[in-house]
Structures are given as C-alpha cells and as structure tokens.
C-alpha cells in the first residue's frame, strides 16, 4: 500500500484484494507493519460503530512499533479526539464540535472568494498553471489558517509539519515542528482572542491543557490541508476528464456538487484511514483480527463495494469518505463548502481550462492513506486579472 504501483492504480489492487480475501485483507502499512484493511462496506460500518470492541487508542500497539517507523506520525497516540476512546474521546469531541460549529459558513464563503481571486490572478495571464502548488494547496492553507486564527508565519510551519506527516517523515521531527508552531499559535490567541477555532478551544469548558490544545489543532490541520487539497484537485480532475462535466448541452451538465458527490464515492481523498485497534482477538466475517493490531477502513474500497455500489451518486450521501460512527468527521459541511466554492471560482474565471497532459501521465504520490496527485498541470487561454472587490 506504500508503493508507487499501488498509488498509480489502487482500484485494481482493491479488486484483487476482494477477489482473493473478501471483506478483510492482511496488508502492510509500511515494511514490517501488519494491519487488516477493511474493504467491505457493511463490515466497515459495523466496526466503525463498535468503539467498545474497536477503540481508536493505539497506545498498546505503539509499544511494538520502532520509533523511526515512517507511519508513526500518522497513527501514534495523541491526546485528541481522533486517537482516544471512551470518556477521553467524548471530552475532546465535544470541544472540537463546539469550536467547528462556531464557524460562520456565510462568512467562510466570502473568505474562500477572497483567497481564490488573488491566487487565480497570479497565473491567469500565463495560460498555464499547476493546480496543486498554485491553487489547491495555497487556498486550503490560507482558509485553514483563517479558520484557526493562525497568521501566515506560524501557518507555514504547520503546513510543513502536515506534509511531513503524510509523507511518513520521522515522528520526532514532525512533532517538534508541530509542537513549536501550534504552541506559538495558542500563546498568540490567549493574548489576542478572535472569532476562530483556536480561541473557541481555549474558552471551552473542557479546560484543555496546552498539550491537548496543540493536539486538537493537529487534528484540524491533519483533516484539513492534505484531504481538502486533494478533494479539490481530484474533483477538478474528474470534471476536466469526464465528458459528462463538459457542459456542452446547456442545463444538462452535472454541477460541481454532483462531481464532489461522485468523487467522494469513487475516489475519496483520504482513501484509507479510520484506524482502530481490537481490544482482544476478534472474529469478523470468518477472520480473526489480532488484538491491538491496526484495523484500517478503506473508504475508497468500501464505497466501491459491489454489495452497495449501483453507480447512482445523485444526492447519495451513504459513502464513507467522511467516516462513520463516533469518529466521523465533524467538519464535513465546512470542507464541502470550501471545495465547492474554490472549484466554482476557478472554473468561472477560466472556463476553457484543460489538462496539459493526458490523465494517465499524471503522477500519484505514494502513501497508504491518501489519494494525492503530485502535480496537476493545466492550460487555458490567457486571461486578464479578475477584479477584487
């Protein structure tokens, strides 16, 4: 799952897994790191909604993992909602949900436009761009910083730490980058509170300690920068390569919303995640799952499970791209709004945009968890800068 071959065509790998193993597949997340990949939809829903038998706390597993394991930064225990269970999880989850629910979605719509237009203006006169480095990443980065109340200098270190985490860089290095940057942000927000997630976390009755605050923000950025950037880019790829989205017949072409819904089903940006650790050996679908070994939900494979997949994505929200159960994403409406608005801004500004190469020449970044393009080169007629109001 960490190979370039898997990154190039994971769906072929999932089909072979299903043919050979059924709903539960023995895999390695990294060399010498065994896990079980769940590729059956109904099995995934069952496991995700059974936190008593499948908790998300990895501490027992972590004791057997070398400190230099490249996926440790992604999976190690942190005092946050993603990597905890029971009352601990409930406390963190309540604080996170309250902080996210305080986001003004109308203001967020305007914030996306305020970021998107200047970004488009940096390349619209060139007639060519890389939509990953010049649009999807910087837009996601700027919007996440705005939501968190994070100034650009601190945010730059956070972004570097997130990229290192998803690429499997040394855990101590990742944590040092994160810890320093996010502690600086917390210190700033104590002195200068604002209408942002960090301030709301600081003010929440859970009375989170600094280490806990830092790790709630790790979750915010971890679930924000890489997955949201990839949601935008992969949806744009679908819209630029699938004739259904060409818009040649007025009023008949599917919308950006339709493309997002389809992409979340067929090729979600966070392809394999929602990791849990059985408390004891557990029999599921005729397979014994070892105690304290990672059980990873393949949102991508489960969404494409022939048992539930009928090809109809219209207003169908039964996919697992946001997860399900007590660890489901609490910010899906925020992510969906940002991606939808960012894509619409780009396509409205550059309606004749197209890929600069064939889709099969695009390179997908290796990694067990994400579905991420390395670059996305596009061309379009040169256009004058947009007016910023």
Residue ranges and their predicted role:
Residues 1-132, 141-159, 163-165, 172:
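Active-site substrate-recognition loop segments, prototypically the cytochrome P450 B′-helix/B-C loop
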Residues 148, 157-207, 211:
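Cytochrome P450 catalytic core segment centered on helix I
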Residues 214-221, 225-250, 330-350:
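Cytochrome P450 catalytic-core helices
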Residues 250-287:
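Conserved cytochrome P450 K-helix E-x-x-R motif and the immediately C-terminal K′/meander segment
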Residues 303-311:
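Cytochrome P450 core scaffold surrounding the K-helix E-X-X-R motif
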Residues 310-376, 384-389:
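Cytochrome P450 heme-thiolate "Cys pocket" and heme-binding signature region
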